[in-house]
Design a protein with these regions (language model features):
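Short hydrophobic beta-strand that contains or immediately precedes a catalytic carboxylate
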Residues: 25-27, 150, 214-217, 265, ...
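Active-site-proximal helix-loop-helix substrate-binding element of RNase H-like nuclease domains
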Residues: 167, 178-195, 224-442
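Acidic catalytic cores of enzymes that act on phosphate-bearing nucleotides/polynucleotides
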Residues: 441-454
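A short acidic-Thr-Gly-centered motif at the start of a beta-strand
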Residues: 14-19, 195-212, 253-258
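Short, glycine/acidic-enriched loop or turn micro-motifs at the edges of active sites
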Residues: 31-32, 72, 155, 218-222, ...
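Short, flexible loop/turn motifs enriched in small residues
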Residues: 18-21, 222-227
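A polyanion-binding, active-site-adjacent surface
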Residues: 1-181
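Two-metal-ion RNase H-like nuclease active-site motif
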Residues: 209-221
Length: 454
């Protein structure tokens, strides 16, 4: 490859190693100093971890697989580790991986049976839609064929708490290669999510008892004011109560007062403040936090979406994915209305230049600044308008004083049918997670008991 303008201080190009016709190709992120010196990928400390510990876990030998990197030279890193959220690092990754001699060209030519990207950068180079937190250790069908995303082997060296998670993924890879990996499949593809009716809660005691687990979740607006409560006591179902529906909330409270089973929340520390502002009183001795349970197990993600996907096969939408499509047009409309307002011209000011001379300075009007903001956004429509607003150096207070409060991201902007599905699915997922986490906890306790008996 030619010397890259994005990385003028690069050293040696480190090509992949291993048989070119290998059925399995591993992709790392970028060479380190040891790799640059020996011109072989994964020969340093991380390489030893990979070759001596992880590859044997899945029954593979280093000389039997193809191993390369998304970025094929030691990049300049004045800011430290490469970060996909930085524009320059992302540009470097996209440019290097797409080079004629880069890793993507090699994959296009070889078309291996299985591709294993290791780390966020490698996953992004292969497919920006891969969500490593959700999908690590799970085979995916992509345009490249079957992909098995993994955390980078160095992850366990930098973050010891990740080591067990990484180890488990390599064991899963071995099972997959042998055809023995069992994947979670959502057993409830057809769900019943809707608003709760007062009659439903009135009839509840006649057809149910109060000893079953009850899962709850809350949603609030951007001011942290309560928006709704969702709950589920039967897998595949969920009900939503709006915060302003005091009649249904009072009936729900009557049901809570008699509840004898566990009441499940995922992150009770957050939800407790919301339910308190809704006027609901939950019996604290019944509360079980599934996020805390996942944390205590040690090798699991704590996010509800990641847990539900990995353990239950449930696909769930992130908050931003639900809210952004409806909040963005409102925010852009707000800015366009603000531009059309007749803003006063600011007074001229005298400022001292770098040479110490006093000069007359004419500040831009707020209208001009807003036009520049919108022009910049129109040139980069994929830009996050909310982040751009938060990062805007000018004072927001003047605009909000004239035009009203900035809409921002809020669940209030989402159509109610979408909100019902999103909120009820959270409660449903929490309910379904409970028996799985219970089983995993019992398994850990049994192993500990056997260990101490030995």
């Amino acid at each position: 490859m030619d010397r890259c303008a994005l990385c003028p201080g690069k050293f040696n190009v480190v090509p992949p190693s291993g048989p070119e016709d290998s059925d399995v190709v591993f992709i790392g992120e970028a060479p380190g100093k040891d790799e640059d010196r020996q011109i072989i990928p994964f020969v340093g400390k991380t390489g030893r971890e990979l070759n001596e510990h992880y590859l044997p876990l899945c029954g593979l030998r280093r000389d039997a697989v193809r191993i390369g990197n998304s970025i094929r030279c030691l990049p300049d890193r004045p800011q430290g580790r490469l970060d996909i959220s930085r524009d320059k690092d992302r540009e470097l990754l996209e440019s290097c991986s797409a080079e004629p001699g880069g890793i993507l060209a090699e994959l296009e030519k070889a078309r291996p049976r299985l591709i294993v990207p290791m780390g966020v950068l490698a996953c992004y180079a292969l497919d920006p839609d891969i969500n490593l937190e959700l999908q690590h250790g799970i085979p995916l069908e992509t345009s490249w064929g079957t992909v098995f995303p993994m955390y980078h082997p160095a992850g366990g060296l930098h973050e010891p708490k990740k080591m067990l998670m990484i180890r488990n993924d390599w064991v899963r890879l071995g099972k997959y290669l042998k055809g023995k990996l069992k994947l979670s499949v959502d057993p409830y593809p057809d769900t019943d999510y809707r608003e709760a009716l007062p009659d439903e809660l009135l009839e509840f005691p006649a057809c149910n008892d109060y000893t079953f687990p009850l899962a709850c979740d809350t949603e609030s607006n951007r001011k942290r004011e309560p928006f709704c409560l969702s709950y589920s006591f039967c897998p595949g179902t969920g009900r939503l109560i709006r915060a302003e529906d005091t009649e249904t909330l009072s009936m729900f409270q009557a049901m809570l007062d008699h509840w004898e089973g566990p009441i499940l929340f995922h992150n009770w520390m957050y939800d407790s403040h919301v339910v308190e502002r809704m006027g609901l009183r939950f019996p604290h001795k019944r509360i079980v936090d599934t996020m805390v349970r996942a944390y205590h197990l040690g090798n699991l993600a704590q996010g509800l979406k990641a847990l539900a996907y990995r353990l239950l096969g449930m696909r769930m939408s992130d908050f931003d994915d639900v809210v952004t499509p409806y909040s963005t047009p409102l925010c852009l409309s707000y800015l366009r209305e603000a531009v059309n307002h007749e803003w006063p011209k600011p007074d001229e000011q005298t400022v001292r230049d770098p040479q110490g001379q006093w000069k007359l300075y004419k500040p831009q009007s707020m209208g001009t600044k807003l036009k520049r903001f919108l022009t910049d956004y129109s040139k980069h429509p994929d830009k996050d308008v909310f982040q751009a607003w938060d990062n805007w150096e000018d004072d927001h207070a003047q605009i909000e004083m004239v035009c009203g409060e900035w809409p921002g991201k809020s669940i209030e902007h989402v159509p109610m049918d979408k909100t019902i599905h999103y909120a009820c699915r959270d409660a449903d997922a929490t309910l379904r997670l409970w028996p799985v986490l219970q089983g995993m906890t019992r398994q850990v306790r049994r192993k500990l008991s056997e260990h101490w008996e030995d």
